[in-house]
Amino acid sequence: MAAKIKRDDEVVVLAGKDKGKQGKVLKVLTDKDRVIVEGVNVVKKHQKPNPALGESGGIVEQEAAIHISNVAILNPETGKADRVGFRLEDGKKVRFFKSNNAII
């Protein structure tokens, strides 16, 4: 199945503790159907020190993955969450917003 949400897309969270937050997609984990969104689902990870790489240990905050069904792409024209469709334009497959047919 084609990816409706890709890296660097602006998305809004639809469900969960961060509902309503907006952010940029940093990574898409296609095999697990999850995305990592900037500033969303921030967790504290206990990091061991690694002298070989020069990393000090401690508690690090980082974004955790959330399920792709809990995010929707943000339409910049309307400022709201929108659905994505696919169509062929000049022999190329393009993504478009279903609300106003604008190409992403």
Curated annotation (Swiss-Prot):
SMART domains: KOW
Protein origin, superkingdom: Bacteria
Gene Ontology biological process terms from the UniProt entry: translation
Gene3D superfamilies for the chain: 2.30.30.30
GO cellular component: ribonucleoprotein complex; ribosome
Pfam family, one: KOW
Molecular function per GO: rRNA binding; structural constituent of ribosome
Keywords in alphabetical order: Ribonucleoprotein, Ribosomal protein, RNA-binding, rRNA-binding
Family designation: Belongs to the universal ribosomal protein uL24 family.
Subunit structure: Part of the 50S ribosomal subunit.
Chain's role: One of two assembly initiator proteins, it binds directly to the 5'-end of the 23S rRNA, where it nucleates assembly of the 50S subunit.
Name the record gives this protein: Large ribosomal subunit protein uL24
Taxonomy of the source species: Bacteria, Pseudomonadati, Pseudomonadota, Gammaproteobacteria, Alteromonadales
